Amino acid sequence: MSKGYSGLFNGTKGSNHNSQTAINTATIDDNLPLVTPKYPLNSYGNFGEKGKNVRVIKSTNPIATSQDFYNKIIPGAKLEILANGKGTKATFPDGTVVVHRITTSTPNSPAVSINIKSNNSKIKSQKIHFIKKGTHND
């Protein structure tokens, strides 16, 4: 004799009754209001200034600035540590990838790489180096 549905395990991992699956539809463009007040996006879809084959954002503390930029641009993405352990990777549902590396081939210049997969993004694929204001790189 069955007691019927009690709801005791509703919402738990094994529950199939009334389960809901949230679908992540976040895009990198959703984060522009968080990013652009401090890091303006130009009309071509780039952050920072033009550098040698990269974009450049200058600050008094490049590591902290790169972390702040990265944290503002990645909400809604799936995070993972890079296989080599030298950075983190954020992947959005549309396949857009943002990578943050503290150590790069340019000394004291952390980097954020943005690889856009959406055709209608306001942001262009780019690599941004964060450099210290007032150095020979400035």
Question: Which stretches of residues belong to each language-model region?
Answer:
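Repetitive, compositionally biased segments used for assembly/scaffolding
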Residues: 94, 100-101, 108-113, 122, ...
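Interface elements of modular peptide-recognition networks comprising either
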Residues: 106-109, 136
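Amphipathic, interaction-prone secondary-structure segments
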Residues: 83-105
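Low-complexity, glycine/serine/proline-rich disordered segments
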Residues: 1-75, 80-83, 88, 114-120, ...
